[in-house]
Amino acid sequence: MAPLKNWDNKTWLSSKKYINSFNRFLLKQIKLNKNSRILDIGCGRGKILDDLSNKLKLLNKPIGLDIENHKDKSKKIIFKKIDALSYVSKTTITFDLILIKQTIHLLKKKQAIKLLSICKNKLNPNGKIIILSLDPNKNEIPTFQLMNKKLNISLKKDEKLFNLILKNQNKFVIKKFTFDVKISK
């Protein structure tokens, strides 16, 4: 079976309402300004970064990493088609915010721990790493049967990883972002 490309391009994940809601939540978690440096791991098309860049009038183009090279990616970001560990290990840039969105479950446990460790060393003073993942216990994403099975496996993996992170890192805090998805037939 061929991989699903652009599956989310016209869904709620790409809607202005979702992006605005997410960025409002994000800006309550961390103080950013026009001089902030932002890295987004799993940026997709860069729509969240694009909106954030506009809101903050960023002087430094945010950097977005993704393993898919989307045709319709934002022009307001520096997009790199590369895996996160490779990029973060080599970059000399430090960041005020490192976002890891819906990607941590794609890594093996050791890779995820290594990525977080390297990311911590790439933060400016007062910088933050924010990991976005679905709540394994409270989500109601409508999916077809095979996708639902894979989603549940990913969510269980995320939950184990978050428990491991919280056990080993006293600086991590969990905050909940919720967004009500309205789907009509």
What is each PLM-predicted segment?
Residues 113-125:
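A short glycine-rich, Lys/Arg-flanked "PGG" loop and its adjoining helix->strand segment in the class I
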Residues 87-93:
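Short amphipathic alpha-helix with an adjacent loop that forms part of the alpha/beta core around
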Residues 36-44:
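Conserved class I S-adenosyl-L-methionine
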Residues 37, 127-128:
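Short glycine-centered segments of the SAM/dcSAM-binding site in methyltransferase folds
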Residues 1-30, 45-77, 81-87, 130-185:
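Class I (Rossmann-like) S-adenosyl-L-methionine-dependent methyltransferase catalytic domain
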Residues 102-103:
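Short catalytic micro-motifs in class I SAM-dependent methyltransferases
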Residues 99:
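A conserved beta-strand element that flanks and buttresses the S-adenosyl-L-methionine
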